[in-house]
C-alpha cells in the first residue's frame, strides 16, 4: 500500500519525513523492517543475497548538492561536496540505488580515504568505524519515472521507498540516501 500522495520528482524532491518507528503507519508493512533498520544495509543485503552483492558506481565527482541535502549537512548554497551514486546488485538484480554526499570538510585527515572507495560499499566502512554516529532515519516515497534518480534506474514503472540518514565520523557529517528498486522484494527477505 502506498500513501495517497506520492511525489512527482520531475520538479521537486520527495517529502522526506522522520520515520517514527518500525510501526510507522505511513509506511507499508512490508517496507517497515527494511526502512527503519538501524544496522548496516550492506550487511543485510549481503545476507539476503547469500554473499552475491555487487556495487556498480554510476558516478562520483564534486558538485553542489541538492537543496535538502545542503540543509541537512549545513552547507552553504554554492558549497560543493563529493557526490557518489551507486547501484547495489543482489543476485545480479538491481536492488538499491544509493546516493552519498560527503562535504569537502569531511574528506580530510584519516577520512580522505573516502575519496577512493571504487566499488567498495560505503556502508562497510561506516559501520566498522568506532566514531560513527547516525542521526534519525528519514523516509520518502518516490514516484515511478522520477528524474532525480539516474536514467539507468529512473525508468522504473512503480513507486519505490527510500530512506536517508546523516552519519558522523569523527563528528564530520555525510549523507547517505538509499532507494529500494522494484527488483528488491522486502517481503520475501524480511
Show the residue positions of the predicted features.
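N-terminal domain-onset segments
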Residues: 1-83, 87-89, 93-146, 150-155, ...
